[in-house]
Amino acid sequence: MQVNISGHQLDVTDALRDYVEEKISRLERHFDRITSVQVIMTVEKLKQKIEATLHVSGAEVVANAEHEDMYAAIDLLADKLDRQLIKHKEKQIERQQGQRPADSPVP
């Protein structure tokens, strides 16, 4: 998985980078087909904003979060992405189960 982290009006420190990478790597326990991740952190007045785009097999998962503290915003973002990935995985499973032929023939 390729992780690209950038900051707008913000210097991305090693501590921030490590924290984001740790949170993103935890997402793989639910969905292991994440190919790349784009994370953009911005500062606007008193708000810390973070946006992430995950490229997964067959789709893109996008989430945004904002908070007064960047670390709290990262936590919120990770929670949102976690829920979205679980939902995406469930949809994929439903599609696969719907495509299988029925066990018994229809009369």
From Swiss-Prot:
Transmembrane segments: none
One GO MF term attached to the UniProt entry: ribosomal small subunit binding
Keyword Oxidoreductase annotated: no
InterPro entries, per the entry: HPF/YfiA_ribosome-assoc, RHF-like, RHF/RaiA
SUPFAM superfamilies: Ribosome binding protein Y (YfiA homologue)
GO cellular component: cytosolic small ribosomal subunit
Record-linked Pfam families: Ribosomal_S30AE
Signal peptide: none
Keywords: Translation regulation
Key word DNA repair present: no
GO biological process, one term: negative regulation of translational elongation
Biological role: During stationary phase, promotes and stabilizes dimerization of 70S ribosomes by the ribosome modulation factor (RMF), leading to the formation of inactive 100S ribosomes.
PANTHER family, A to Z: 30S RIBOSOMAL PROTEIN
The family this protein is said to belong to: Belongs to the HPF/YfiA ribosome-associated protein family. Short HPF subfamily.
Summary of subunit composition and partner proteins: Associates exclusively with 100S ribosomes, which are dimers of 70S ribosomes.
NCBIfam families xrefs: yfiA (TIGR00741)
Protein name: Ribosome hibernation promoting factor
Annotated organism of origin: Azotobacter vinelandii
